[in-house]
Swiss-Prot record:
EC number(s) stated in the UniProt entry for this protein: 2.7.4.25
Signal sequence residues: none
Cited Gene3D superfamilies: P-loop containing nucleotide triphosphate hydrolases
Organism: Xanthobacter autotrophicus (strain ATCC BAA-1158 / Py2)
Pfam families per record: Cytidylate_kin
GO cellular component terms given for this protein: cytoplasm
Listed name of the protein: Cytidylate kinase
Length: 208
């Protein structure tokens, strides 16, 4: 079984993906980390605006070296949004994601284009969202908890900028797949959101 979870930044899709993967005993890939890793590489090289450098970084990326905690900074979130808008970067990471999804038994993937581009035939598709304000509150708490000194207003502006860039890009824009189920987590806590997501997946498994 392949479960595809898409949605904007800080919508809760990653948390739900990890919990669903643990529940079903499936491997999980946060595809956003791939773009954050590419962003980290070109930032370190001083080449964030160099498309060729970002494509090369994506082409040679080793998933085994990813450090999720180190990649979850506000700066790398912004860098990820920049490099993810480049068709060459997305193409370079496509095969890696396809191979992950094709594992025996299935997988859970979350990102921006899983249900539309990476796994269009996934058995269960969710589009997880929440209001920009709620998402900014969540991301702000996360960043403060990690020791980053950042204002809520800055995080909200960043969320809105990333939403616009993700939705407007030419390469695999953020859109809800026609057969994805919308899950708005604005008023839900983690337990409620997981219960709703699990119900959606179980309904799809039962053919409903």
């Amino acid at each position: 079984m392949v479960i595809a979870i898409d949605g904007p930044a800080a919508s809760g899709k990653g948390t739900l993906a990890r919990r669903l993967a643990a529940y079903y005993g499936l491997p999980h890939l946060d595809t956003g980390l791939l773009y954050r890793a590419v962003g980290a590489i070109v930032l370190a090289q001083g080449q964030l605006q160099d498309e060729a450098a970002s494509v090369e970084a994506a082409r040679t990326l080793d998933v085994a070296t990813l450090d999720p905690e180190a990649l979850r900074t506000a700066e790398l979130g912004e860098a990820a949004s920049v490099v993810a808008a480049r068709g060459g970067v997305r193409a370079a990471l496509l095969d890696l994601q396809h191979r992950f999804a094709a594992q025996p038994g299935g997988a859970v993937l979350d990102g921006r284009d899983i249900g539309t581009v990476i796994c269009p035939k996934a058995q269960a598709k969710l589009f997880v969202t929440a209001s920009p304000e709620v998402r900014a509150e969540r991301r702000h708490r996360e960043l403060i908890g990690r020791g980053e000194d950042v204002a809520y207003e800055t995080v909200l502006a960043d969320i809105r900028k990333r939403d616009e860039r993700d939705s407007a890009r030419a390469a695999a824009p953020l859109v809800q797949a026609d057969d994805a189920v919308l899950l708005d987590t604005s008023a839900l806590d983690i337990a409620q959101a997981f219960a709703a997501a699990l119900a959606i997946v179980e309904a799809r498994r039962a053919g409903r």
